[in-house]
Amino acid sequence: MKEILLKQHIGSPAKAVVKPGDRVRRGSLLAVPEGLGANVHSSVDGLVKEIKEDRIFVEESVEQCDGFEPISGKDILSLIQDAGIVGMGGAGFPTAIKLNIDLKGGYLLVNAAECEPLLKHNMRQILEQPEKTLRGIDYAMQSCKAAKAVIAIKKKHEEEINLLLRTLPDFPNISLHLLPDLYPMGEERAVVREVLGILLPPTALPSEAGAVVINVETCLRIAEAVEEKKPSFLKNSTVAGKLKKGKESQVFMDVPVGTTVGELIKMAGGIDGEYGEILFGGPFTGTAVSLSTPITKTSGGILVTEPFPDLKGAKTGVLICACGGNMDRMEDLCKKYNATLTAVQACKQAVDVRGTLKCENPGNCPGQAAKILHFKNKGCTDILIGNCSDCTNTVMGSAPKMNLTVHHQTDHVLKTVGMEPMRYLTKSKTVEQLPVNEEGRQIPFPKEEKKQGSSGGGEERRDSGTLDAKEERKSDTEAFIEEGLFHIRIEEGQDIHIEFS
């Protein structure tokens, strides 16, 4: 039985256009949007058994055909709309609406950052289907009238980058921009900033910078819709964690929507003994789900963690970050850690935008010393944070000196797979871009310059020698002065006065 959710997108749940007893094929239209939303299609051949307010139950036929019921759009944009394609990086914004814009020669920015630790399915897609991915990018460019497209991808992915470089000569208006291996380089405004050098305010859309940002898997589904008239009912996903087949990430391509988390975990070998939780998504922004939760168009990762550590009721302060878990997630983790939630603060750069926290400058932190001092003054012994690579680094600049034990929301996930916890920033926030030949085409780095260490996510290790001098961590005194926590007053012939705020 497949449970196909009616809300797999930003907006309202779609309205069912089938009824119990109807026979459906793979690709059959099950529901249409009412207002903002996207079409929902069956991922299997079968019989509609039940319709609820939020989902449709389809009983699978014993025999499944290889084909599908095609869509009937007449141009690129209508095919994307009919296919029900949404942003497949997790946000789920309807793609036809996003691309229904005249950029007047602007940029299509393709997000291939895959910035959450452990997730591997975007890179597998590039390795297996580079040409089709690039064709999807070209179709998206035509839809939004972009003059150029830029694929934003982490520099560490050498094999994928070199494969794209070999394929790009057939697509002269598409280029690559290399990203550092830090979180959250895949955040929409971070992509705009890194590629175009424009920092948008938290309330702005990429269109204000003359750009549209689209996920790399979304581009693949666009190519399928245009070339094969194929609806969107499949999802690429990564499964990792406490599994019998090992802790390494396993990639599953073209998983039918409605497949349960439990079914996909079974395909990955099953859970190895007791576990803490199962996450949908990545270690930073994932949400806890059950084995019966169905896969949707936005389900990028399934992570099975080891059991939670026991903080034995420790007084814990929670630092909410726009780049990580929201308040509900952090409260849930406090309970699972057996911690006493004592104080809550938001990251210095987090601003409220229509009820959602947004970062003023994703991945660049001015310092968190004031927040840490607040926790100390409230009697906390521990702090739980969900911050990005840079913010976590600034927390570590002051919390240990105040005898506060730091826990990151990703700790139990990363420990499960043997990765180092997020603590100190050890890699530069800038990376060298690809060289260009005499014809103006990007080419691979010379071999002796190709190897780069990995950082970001949970792979960061404390190694101060890898940072440029200008990027070294501020001293506690510098951080406290910068945040206005105390002032030093020096007058000729007088004692030095330190005034605490």
Region roles according to the model:
Residues 66-110, 119:
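Hydrophobic alpha-helical hairpins/lids featuring a short glycine-rich hinge
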